[in-house]
C-alpha cells in the first residue's frame, strides 16, 4: 500500500479539489484507494457534514461513510486549534495517528491523507500538522495554488519538509485562476530554486485524465511504501 499525506502551501489552495480528482482517476483505473480527512472544519451548505468531507464522499459515490474518513470535524471554518479550544476538543496526535494507521490493514493500493491547511497548521498550543506527518513518516504531496506569493509559500514549505527529512513525493501546481499571469514562469522558478520538478500542472475545470500520469508515478514500485 502506498501512502501520501496531502498538504497545501496555505488554506484554500485546492487540496480537496486535487484529492477528489486523484480519487476519480483511481476509481476509473480500478486502483483501490481511500482518502482520509482526519481533521475538517467548515460545514457544507448542503448537509451537516464538513464541506471537504462531503466532497470526498461524493467523489467515491458514497461507498464510504463520513466516520470512515473523518475523525474530528468542526462546523466553523476556523483554525483547528482555536475552535478545538473553544469547544473543548482534544486534537491528539496519537489519536489521529491511530485513526490513520488503523486503515493500513485494509485491502488498498493507495491511501491518501488530506491535511488541514498548510504544513504548520496548529492542532493545539504545542503541536502542529508537521508533528503528525513526522509521527507517520510517510511522503508528502504538496499542492500549490499558482498566484502572487506562491513562490515564497512553496519554497518555505519544501525547505521545512527537507529540514525535517520528510520525503516530498511531488508537488502539484493548481492553476485554477485564469487571471493569473506568468504561470509557467512561476512554476519554473519554484522548480529551479527548490530542485523539485512540478509533478502535475492542473488548469481550471481539469478532467481526471489530467491526473493519470501523476497516478502512475504514485503507484509505481519505485515510490516508497
Curated annotation (Swiss-Prot):
Which residues participate in substrate binding? 41
Q: Give the first-level EC class, as a single word.
A: ligase
Q: Which residues bind Mg(2+)?
A: 16, 52, 114
Q: Which GO terms describe its molecular function?
A: ATP binding; dethiobiotin synthase activity; magnesium ion binding
Q: In which pathway does it act?
A: Cofactor biosynthesis; biotin biosynthesis; biotin from 7,8-diaminononanoate: step 1/2
Q: For this UniProt record, give its keywords in alphabetical order, as a comma-separated list.
A: ATP-binding, Biotin biosynthesis, Cytoplasm, Ligase, Magnesium, Metal-binding, Nucleotide-binding
Per its Swiss-Prot or TrEMBL entry, what cofactor is needed? Mg(2+)
Q: What is its EC number?
A: 6.3.3.3
Any idea which positions bind ATP? Answer: 12-17, 52, 114-117, 174-175
Tell me what reaction this enzyme catalyses: (7R,8S)-7,8-diammoniononanoate + CO2 + ATP = (4R,5S)-dethiobiotin + ADP + phosphate + 3 H(+)
Question: Which species?
Answer: Francisella tularensis subsp. tularensis (strain SCHU S4 / Schu 4)
An example of a Gene Ontology cellular component annotation for this protein is: cytosol
- Report quaternary structure and partners: Homodimer.
Full protein name: ATP-dependent dethiobiotin synthetase BioD
Amino acid at each position: 500500500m502506498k501512502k501520501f499525506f496531502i498538504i497545501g502551501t496555505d488554506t484554500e489552495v485546492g487540496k480537496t479539489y486535487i484529492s477528489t480528482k486523484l480519487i476519480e482517476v483511481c476509481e476509473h483505473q480500478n486502483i483501490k484507494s481511500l482518502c482520509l480527512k482526519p481533521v475538517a472544519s467548515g460545514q457544507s451548505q448542503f448537509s451537516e457534514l464538513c464541506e471537504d468531507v462531503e466532497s470526498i464522499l461524493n467523489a467515491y459515490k458514497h461507498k464510504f461513510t463520513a466516520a470512515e474518513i473523518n475523525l474530528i470535524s468542526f462546523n466553523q471554518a476556523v483554525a483547528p486549534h482555536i475552535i478545538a479550544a473553544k469547544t473543548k476538543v482534544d486534537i491528539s496526535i496519537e489519536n489521529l495517528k491511530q485513526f490513520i494507521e488503523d486503515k493500513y490493514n485494509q485491502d488498498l493500493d493507495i491511501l491518501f491523507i488530506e491535511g488541514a491547511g498548510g504544513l504548520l497548521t496548529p492542532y493545539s498550543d504545542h503541536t502542529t500538522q508537521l508533528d503528525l506527518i513526522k509521527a507517520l513518516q510517510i511522503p508528502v504531496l504538496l499542492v500549490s495554488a499558482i498566484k502572487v506569493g506562491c513562490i515564497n509559500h512553496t519554497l518555505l514549505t519544501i525547505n521545512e519538509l527537507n529540514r525535517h527529512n520528510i520525503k516530498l513525493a511531488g508537488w502539484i501546481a493548481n492553476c485554477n485562476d485564469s487571471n493569473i499571469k506568468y504561470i509557467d514562469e512561476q512554476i519554473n522558478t519554484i522548480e529551479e530554486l527548490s530542485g523539485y520538478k512540478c509533478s502535475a500542472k492542473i488548469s481550471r475545470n481539469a478532467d481526471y485524465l489530467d491526473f493519470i500520469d501523476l497516478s502512475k508515478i504514485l503507484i509505481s514500485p519505485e515510490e516508497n511504501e
